[in-house]
């Protein structure tokens, strides 16, 4: 996040929405679930506890061909509560499950909720007030992770927080381009006009938001509502998630790059494209320089027959210093420059975040920020590089029930043999 963005956010205060809902609308909450036996119970308990008239609430769980006990657990709740409906279908992916649920819903308001995400009791009321106050068609919440025990989870905690603050700025430009899975609120009229979720798109939440933007629907980001979600707890799962997000952005950017919203087209898309170029490029430059300098250093050791005694004895000589300090030269300068920029950003970020989240101590926020500072450049560069590789050479990649085959090599082969 850039310095000018954070300076802008320093002046941001939570906006109190003084709006009374005179008549509560019928709300249908669609919960797509695939192998969510560990999470579905907690999610349903939280939905039952929502502060909303139960005669105006409809919870629809769509089991998307789970291989665990997700369906059985959900059915137990259906038997207890008349406002819960549970369906089971063949595995077809999240979009397919969402569409299945929406087509069987009756609410004038549709809420999508990932089965591993948890709303607060007042989340729905706040989101609806936000929707009516701003006359919005879609309202998107902030998202934060539940678990922060592992380093990989602490990294994601800060990453989500940064995205939340970015959302505030993007919202000011009327350029919200993701209707995230955890508790996005839609007017039914949106789906009636532009259709349901794209079942072939691996980033359906981005695609539906961009399609709504293209059709001039108003999307608002509601930072006052923070939905908790379960993050990937290992690097392999995180890599798979972020590669999917990156491929989804590339596909959706290609599809909607001519969108009329100039702020979205030129600024939001532009910044993302620049990052997708600079991050892997910087990473590869650093990797190359480290490799070259290490090679030169090992070459020097070889020239002295790996005589460690000679090396230690002459370790302060000019020649050896040249080899040693080359390891800390240009590549480290690039890294230090990035670190200084990020450090300034995080000092500002920490001061803002404490206004926003009182649950973490100053020490925790600083600790998490240091972890993010250390990993962010490398992680994001790796995510982008792997995604670009798949975009060029990937054949048939599967995410849930969706098979992604939108790579350059597949297009060339289809053109050649199609």
Predicted regions and their residues:
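Short, acidic, metal-binding catalytic loop of nucleotide-sugar glycosyltransferases
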Residues: 45-56
């Amino acid at each position: 996040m850039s310095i000018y963005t954070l300076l802008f956010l320093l002046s941001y205060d939570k906006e109190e929405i003084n709006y009374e809902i005179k008549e509560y609308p019928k709300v249908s909450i669609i919960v797509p679930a695939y192998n969510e036996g560990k999470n579905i119970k907690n999610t349903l308990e939280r939905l039952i506890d929502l502060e909303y008239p139960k005669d105006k609430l409809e919870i629809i769980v769509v089991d998307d061909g789970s291989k665990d006990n997700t369906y059985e657990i959900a059915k137990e709740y259906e038997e207890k509560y008349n406002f819960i409906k549970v369906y089971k279908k063949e595995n077809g992916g999240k979009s397919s499950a969402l569409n299945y649920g929406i087509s069987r819903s009756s609410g004038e308001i549709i809420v999508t909720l990932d089965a591993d995400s948890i709303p607060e009791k007042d989340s729905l009321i706040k989101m609806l007030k936000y929707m009516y106050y701003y006359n919005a068609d879609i309202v998107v919440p902030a998202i934060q992770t539940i678990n922060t025990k592992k380093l990989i989870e602490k990294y994601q905690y800060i990453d989500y927080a940064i995205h939340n603050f970015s959302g505030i700025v993007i919202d000011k430009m009327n350029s919200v381009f993701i209707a995230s899975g955890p508790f996005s609120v839609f007017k039914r009229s949106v789906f009636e006009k532009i259709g349901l979720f794209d079942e072939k798109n691996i980033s359906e939440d981005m695609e539906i938001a961009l399609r709504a933007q293209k059709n001039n629907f108003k999307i608002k980001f509601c930072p006052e509502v923070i939905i908790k979600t379960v993050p990937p707890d290992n690097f392999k799962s995180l890599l798979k998630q972020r590669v999917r997000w990156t491929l989804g952005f590339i596909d959706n950017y290609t599809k909607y790059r001519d969108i009329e919203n100039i702020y979205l087209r030129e600024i939001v898309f532009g910044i993302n494209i620049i990052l997708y170029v600079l991050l892997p490029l910087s990473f590869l430059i650093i990797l190359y320089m480290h490799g070259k300098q290490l090679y030169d250093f090992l070459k020097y050791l070889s020239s002295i027959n790996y005589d460690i005694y000679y090396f230690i004895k002459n370790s302060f000589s000019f020649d050896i210093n040249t080899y040693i300090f080359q390891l800390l030269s240009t590549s480290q300068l690039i890294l230090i420059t990035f670190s200084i920029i990020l450090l300034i950003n995080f000092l500002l970020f920490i001061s803002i975040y404490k206004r926003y989240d009182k649950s973490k101590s100053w020490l925790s926020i600083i600790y998490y920020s240091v972890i993010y500072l250390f990993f962010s450049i490398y992680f994001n560069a790796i995510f982008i590089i792997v995604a670009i590789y798949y975009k060029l050479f990937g054949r048939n990649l599967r995410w849930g029930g969706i098979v992604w085959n939108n790579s350059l090599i597949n297009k060339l082969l289809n053109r050649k043999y199609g």
